[in-house]
Regions:
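Conserved AMP-binding/adenylate-forming core of the ANL superfamily
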Residues: 60-117, 134-139, 187-190, 229-230
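Conserved pre-ATP/AMP-binding loop-to-beta segment of ANL
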Residues: 60-62, 172, 178, 192-214, ...
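AMP-binding/adenylate-forming catalytic core of the ANL superfamily
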Residues: 133, 143, 150-153, 301, ...
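Conserved AMP-binding A3 loop
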Residues: 74-78, 210-234
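Conserved ATP/PPi-binding loop(s) of AMP-dependent carboxylate-activating enzymes
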Residues: 383-386, 397-430, 466-468
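Conserved AMP-binding/adenylation subdomain of ANL enzymes
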Residues: 233-250, 257-300, 314
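Gly/Ser/Thr-rich phosphate-binding loop
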Residues: 187-189, 272, 298-303, 313-375, ...
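AMP-binding/adenylate-forming catalytic domain of the ANL superfamily
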Residues: 526-551, 567-573
Length: 573
């Protein structure tokens, strides 16, 4: 744990005084801002799109900007209202109604967002599949979700596993002619323009399923996490406080819509706040990312340490060539920020990055370094107003600060997953300690309530009579001037106590050597504790990670045992 404290320089934020807002907060403040009927049912698209489209002062405001293949397309709130109604009318005409499921397998593009809005209007449950998902991943998701339709591109049809398509009645194609003719293809462009641009508002219970997002199961098949229309209350509150979104802001969330961050914070979150969303569909390059920040005058950028590391690798000369004067706030998600990334970002992009924490099951940001709060390096911040967290022991009892336990949340926030699709037992396991949602993340809190993650509960390393989280050891190793990244696991032996093994990648100009191996071990003992049982260091070309940049330590443990890595839903190719 690093004691350094970075003073906040944020002005005119939505949050203001954190302590005051946290004490007096009520979810009702944000619930009242949604479009509802007299029974309390929600019109999510009415709240996110129609509210602005029907107001002459905001109807022409840009809501969605998509940059793809050298072309920039802009859609106003009125455009999205009309297009989403046409898509809803198309789906309704094909027989889709509340509870049906539409899966989406597309590269980044506006059609993903048209489909999300159309489904939300009708109560159809959407699921955005990652465009790079492999055959086995697609098969697992399709067999579990049993969609009525799949929205895709003709080039993707042959990637779909035939055995998993028995429930599918329609293949909705973004262009034609189809590469195969099964009699179930519908070419959207051939029918959409003739459909009405208006549709009647539809209200749904807060408990009506909105979308499914598939995430990896460390010990089983992918989990289909179900979220509902009532999430909109928490989504808006988190975007308002954690991302500090104002009406008219331009937000760029650079996560793929196949991951929950992209699903939530590139669509409904900015629109519920009256902001614009930027979608960059080009492959990553540092110049493309910098150009996007400059060209689209981004005010709020929601990114990840994985992206920041790539920018660091591209060098410090590039940022100075671009104008970031419109950028006001940078937020990060996926893993805790290292001090090195924090200071690089602050020094080269002129703004400190603010960590956020949440997971697919929480549906919204729950913990953040809010822009009005001082930042403590390596801390993910403090709970969002309205969210109660604690670090608890194995019995669910809250622990004192600076004592490691499992991060838990009182299950009263409005975006909590309503279930796991077709898997009630695994869902109920999150609540196995009465009164708490157990996150699986190990953490400690300090005297000011800041939270520090220590790894997943199955990543903990038991040394003599205490548990050690791998994250702190990895951070120390990563500070060695020759090291790029590190991952740490435990090793057991019948001959003696538990020890640690580190997997390390070094900078491109540094050759691995036995001398460096010894140096790293000594560095950890000197900078953390002489009792740390780091017995082995193995150099690797790259570490196994999810596509959002998280280390997959179980893959390293499996490697040590000569076993398969398990489900790879979220791992890179």
């Amino acid at each position: 744990m690093i004691k350094a404290r970075i003073r906040s320089q944020c002005e005119n934020s939505n949050l203001g005084d954190y302590e005051k807002v946290y004490r007096s907060f009520s979810w009702e403040k944000f619930s009242e801002q949604l479009v509802k009927d007299q029974t309390g049912r929600i019109d999510l698209v009415g709240s996110a799109i129609d509210l602005w489209a029907d107001n002459p002062e905001t109807a022409d405001q840009v809501a969605l900007i998509v940059e793809k293949a050298g072309e920039i397309r802009r859609f106003s709130y009125q455009d999205l209202q009309e297009i989403s109604c046409q898509w809803a009318n198309m789906l309704s005409g094909l027989g889709y109604c509340s509870g049906d499921r539409l899966f989406v397998l597309l590269p980044q593009g506006p059609e993903i967002y048209f489909a999300m809005l159309a489904c939300a209007r009708l109560g159809v449950v959407f699921c955005i599949l990652h465009s790079k998902a492999d055959f086995a991943q697609l098969e697992a998701c399709l067999l579990n979700g049993k969609p009525k339709g799949i929205l895709t591109h003709p080039d993707y049809l042959e990637r779909l596993p035939a055995e998993a398509l028995t429930s599918v009645r329609h293949f909705l194609l973004t262009q034609g002619p189809p590469v195969a003719t099964s009699g179930h293809e519908v070419v959207i462009n051939e029918i959409i323009t003739s459909l009405p641009k208006r549709c009647d508002p539809k209200f749904h219970s807060p408990k009506t399923p909105l979308y499914i997002v598939y995430t990896s199961g460390s010990t089983g098949p992918p989990k289909g996490v179900v979220h509902s229309h009532g999430d909109s209350v928490g989504i808006k509150a988190s975007a308002y406080y954690a991302l500090d979104l104002h009406p008219g802001d331009i937000l760029w969330t650079d996560g793929d819509p196949g991951w929950v961050t992209g699903t939530v914070y590139s669509s409904f979150a900015p629109w519920l706040c009256g902001a614009s969303s930027v979608v960059q569909a080009e492959p990553f390059s540092a110049s493309t990312w910098y150009r996007t920040l400059e060209r689209h005058k981004i005010n709020v950028w929601y990114t990840s340490p994985m992206i920041l590391r790539k920018l660091v690798a591209a060098g410090e000369d590039l940022p100075g060539r671009y104008d970031f004067s419109k950028l006001r706030h940078i937020a990060s998600v996926g893993e805790p920020l290292t001090p090195e990334l924090f200071f690089w970002c602050r020094n080269n992009l002129n703004h400190p990055p603010h960590d956020t924490w949440w997971m697919s099951e929480t549906g919204m940001i729950l913990v953040a370094n809010f822009c009005t709060m001082d930042i403590k390096l390596t801390s993910i911040g403090r709970p969002l107003p309205g969210v109660e967290t604690a670090v608890v022991d194995e019995n669910g009892e809250p622990l004192n600060f600076l004592t490691m336990g499992e991060l838990a949340v009182r299950p009263n926030w409005p975006a909590m997953a309503s279930g796991l699709w077709q898997d009630r037992e695994r869902y109920e396991d999150y609540f196995r300690r009465e009164g708490w949602f157990l996150t699986g993340d190990m953490a400690v809190t300090d005297e000011d309530g800041y939270i520090y993650l220590q790894g997943r509960n199955d990543d903990l390393i038991k040394v003599e009579d205490k548990f050690i989280g791998p994250y702190e050891v990895e951070q120390i190793i990563a500070r060695h001037p020759s090291v790029s990244e590190a991952a740490v696991i435990s090793r057991t032996s019948v001959e003696g106590p538990v020890t640690m093994k580190a997997f390390v990648t070094v900078h491109s100009d540094i050759p691995p050597s036995s001398r460096l191996n010894l140096e790293i071990k000594a560095y950890v003992k000197a900078n953390l504790s002489p009792d740390i049982p780091l017995k082995e260091v193995e150099f690797m070309d790259e570490l196994p990670k999810t596509s959002t940049g998280k280390l997959v330590r179980r893959a390293l443990r499996a490697k040590e045992l000569g076993l398969p890595a398990g489900d790879t839903m979220n791992m890179t190719d």
